[in-house]
């Protein structure tokens, strides 16, 4: 969030951005703990709260002691195992479906597994569900995580030049498209498979794939893949804890401190933050586990659009306009936050689709931020230009 300070000359905006990111990460880490632990609990009979505590403690320990380097390597190893495992699961699933992949594509076409019956391609009302709004909303959510989420951005800083960064981004994009395709095919494949076979009694809405892994895959591979899912969740947790610690130390503590913090002091603060935030995320995850979440996928995407949408709106305001200033950006941030809280908690869920959250946040940021900045400049006689490299107009 150093960018916000550079672009708008405001420590306050940098701190606000960091606080919003930390809120997002706590919610994200909580859902990441909740999902695999609910699945393993239903399959093993172990209390879900105990599994959440164990997962959280392990993630806290190696985030606390290992730092970013350990996080990156565990991410790579566990991610590789998970990628290979789910790809194998897809091929194994296809081999045991009567008709193979052709049956899956038939389900796409005839059983509304590609588009729901009541889901139009386009709806002029952007507050309602449509394929267009899902694509645009998901696109802005993804853009928000790549532009304004410290856990993603900190990976960029590990590269040594833009050539390697571009290569990393292209590889990431290709793998993301591949793994998303694999999971969507698995989802429809499971629907077809359980039309042809009995559904295990333990399988709930968010647990069908895990039930398939446990009851249908070869025994040795079942244990490996379930362990990989659990480990990958721990790895993602440690990434979140590490990024929260870095953001708190550099974007909040260092900005608010009257004297410069030594490297040793920053490290110690980061470790304490990892511990405190980790414990808090464990508590929130236990609340989710006992709160009857209907669809974790929809809950998380709604939460992501709610929080990251506000952040990405501020980043877009800064990067794509020259007129935006501290006053306008701060007012836009506050207005977008107020509007989104109002929509989330005071508007019926069926009136506004979760995929519109980020679109609304960005629109409010621009509609409020640009006029407010122009009025402020006119009143104050401010003719200052943005710092070099902070907008698309000053990047050369």
PLM region descriptions:
Residues 1-396:
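Membrane-embedded helix-loop-helix hairpins and adjacent transmembrane boundary segments
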